Amino acid sequence: PAAAGFGTADLLYSSKAAPIANWVKFGNALKLRLGLILADKDPAKAKTIIEAAAANVFTSEADNASFPYTLSTPNNNPISTNANKALTTRTDYIAAKFIIDKMNALEDPRRPGFFTMVGGAYIGGYYGFSNSYANFSTMAPKIAAYDFPALLMDYPETEFGLAEAGKRGFTVPGTPEQHYNNAVTASIKYWGGTDAQAATYLARPDVAFTTASANYKEVIGTQKWLALYNRGYESWTEWRRLDFPALAPPSAATAPAGQSVPAGLSIPVRLIYPINEQTLNGAKRAEAAAAIGGDLVTTKLFWDVN
C-alpha cells in the first residue's frame, strides 16, 4: 500500500500494528459472507469466492470490525438512546419468548450478557403483544451502555462461515467441527462467559456439532443465529438463507390470554420498496416489482432459494 494506514480517520483498525492487513482480513471475511449467501443459488461461484478468501480471514476476536462509540453525545451507541429511554420512561422493550425459551432449554451461558433476570429466571414475552413489563426480562445493561460498540463483522461469524463452507465441500483450512467450536467459544467469551462454560456448553448433545442435528444447516444456523444477537439484519439474512432455527409464522403463534393473532400473517423475507420510490418512480417500481414476483414482504430475494 501507499501508506501504512489511514491514521486516526480509521475508526476500526487505527490502533492495530498493521491496519491495512486487518482491512484485508475484513475484506476476505466479507467475501466469505457474500459467498455463502450465493451458495444455494450458484454453488460454483460461491466455491470460487470462498476458496480464494478463506486462507486470510479473521483468526481471533482481535480482528473484529468493531465500530467504537463514546460516552459523549452525539457519538454514543444509538441503541443506548432508545434503550435508556425505555428503561426510564417507556415499558416496551422486553426479551422475546422464542429466544429466551431456546436459550433456557440449552442453558446458554450468554444469557447474562443478553438479558436481565426476573425473580431469578429469564422470562420472555410474546413478541408483538401487550406484555407486563415488570414480569419479563429486558436487555442487559451492557447493550444499553453509551459506549457499547457495534460489530460490523466478527470472528465467530467468520468461524461459522468456515464451518459451513467445509460442510458444503469447499476447500478451506481446518475442519467444520473445529470452526464451529471456535465460533461458539468466541461468542460465549465475547458476551462475558469463560472457556470452561463454553466447553460445558459444547459437550451438550443438543449443542455438540456431531449430535445436535443430522442437518448441518440446523446445527450451524441455530448457533449462528444466537451469536448474531444484537445484529438484526445479519441474523435475519442467516435465517432466510439457512432456514434455522425453525421460527413459527405469526399465524401459528400462541397468543397470551385474552389476545389473538390476526389471520394470514407470515414472516417477512424482504423489505418492500419505500413509499418515495412508489411516489416518484412509480412506473419503474412497478416494472421491478413484476420482475421479482411482486413488491411483497413474502417475495424471496434471488439467493433465498429454499
Regions found by a protein language model. Name each.
Residues P1-G193, T210-K217:
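Structured, solvent-exposed acidic/aromatic patches
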Residues I188-N306:
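C-terminal functional modules
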